[in-house]
Amino acid sequence: MLIAQRPTLIEDPISEFRSRFVIEPLEPGFGYTLGNSLRRTLLSSIPGASVTSIRIDGVLHEFSTVPGVKEDVTDLILNLKELVVSSDNDEPTVMYLRKQGPGEVTAADIAPPAGVEVHNPELRLATLNDKGKLEIELTVERGRGYVSAAQNKQAGQEIGRIPIDSIYSPVLKVTYKVEATRVEQRTDFDRLIVDVETKPSISPRDAMASAGKTLVGLFGLAQELNAEAEGVDIGPSAADAALAADLALPIEEMDLTVRSYNCLKREGIHTIGELVSRSEADLLDIRNFGQKSIDEVKTKLGAMGLQLKDSPPGFDPRQAVDTYGTDAYSPSFSDPSDDGAEFIETEQY
């Protein structure tokens, strides 16, 4: 079985809606393979939402004008194409804009229903004079990529409904480059750098994750031809390898007090992996293993970035250290190999 080193993916945020992702090390040639696939998927296949049609009160077609509105309907449509929305609804959703002049009309004047959000409320849509009045019904749908107004036009649609171009993709720009990187003595590995800029409706991180999910599903079709086919297995990451090494360590490496150590050994807990698979309730069931022993174990595990199976969130190992002191956790003169030693019921530290 051939095993390749697992690459790491690091996000380097540039701004709120732009990030640079670095993936390395990749086998020679895979930088371009992965980079091109990610770029095309990010630009064309990330789900989003967009306005697909509008209906303006008193307007029959897109070449009309609205009394009291500086912009004609064509300009208004161009402005609405810049609207950034997101929708949790699978079905088409209607939102309304109602504004009376004088003054500017912005996206903040739109009243979205539940499940729909306007992400650029500062967008200027139109300008009204003293007698101006604007009422618009906007239909929002979910989709992918780009759909033209002609494709959005439905057979038998009502008079006065104007289909518009829909840009569903929430990703604005994607670039990538491949550099050489070194792994031990080899210098021909690839480092892939992907620069992703998105609309406010999605973060670059979520867009990248969505693209990865799509590609995994598509490439899985080839794997389904023969699930037992031999390939290059990706080895564990450095973090996973370090975790596995920590879990394999004997509990002697934790430098526990003799009391806690002997209680665990009598229970048949010999490695850190066996220890973290137990809950606090499991440990409290051990004879002579009380709350102070629990706190000691949690403190030692916390220093290693580990915790018991059911440790509540927010446990601060440093607080336990401050409470009980570090000296209290140093071994005493008792023999740690005496697994069968008897203890009195009160805990002594």
Curated annotation (Swiss-Prot):
Annotated region described as Alpha C-terminal domain (alpha-CTD), given as residue ranges: 241-349
A Pfam family matched in the record: RNA_pol_L
Catalysed reactions, semicolon-separated: RNA(n) + a ribonucleoside 5'-triphosphate = RNA(n+1) + diphosphate
Domain remark from Swiss-Prot or TrEMBL: The N-terminal domain is essential for RNAP assembly and basal transcription, whereas the C-terminal domain is involved in interaction with transcriptional regulators and with upstream promoter elements.
Alphabetical list of InterPro entries matching this protein: DNA-dir_RNA_pol_insert (IPR011262), DNA-dir_RNA_pol_RpoA/D/Rpb3 (IPR011263), DNA-dir_RpoA (IPR011773), RBP11-like (IPR036603), RNAP_asu_C (IPR011260), RNApol_insert_sf (IPR036643)
CDD domains the record matches: RNAP_alpha_NTD (cd06928)
Enzyme class: transferase
Organism, scientific name: Frankia casuarinae (strain DSM 45818 / CECT 9043 / HFP020203 / CcI3)
Designated gene of the protein: rpoA
Keyword Signal on entry: no
Single GO term (MF): DNA-directed RNA polymerase activity
Ranges for region Alpha N-terminal domain (alpha-NTD): 1-226
Protein name: DNA-directed RNA polymerase subunit alpha
GO annotations of cellular component type: cytoplasm; DNA-directed RNA polymerase complex
Function according to Swiss-Prot or TrEMBL: DNA-dependent RNA polymerase catalyzes the transcription of DNA into RNA using the four ribonucleoside triphosphates as substrates.
Chain residue ranges for the region called Disordered: 309-349
Quaternary structure annotation from Swiss-Prot or TrEMBL: Homodimer. The RNAP catalytic core consists of 2 alpha, 1 beta, 1 beta' and 1 omega subunit. When a sigma factor is associated with the core the holoenzyme is formed, which can initiate transcription.
Any one biological process term the GO annotation gives: DNA-templated transcription
Taxonomic path: Bacteria, Bacillati, Actinomycetota, Actinomycetes, Frankiales
Compositionally skewed regions (Acidic residues) per UniProt: 336-349
EC number: 2.7.7.6
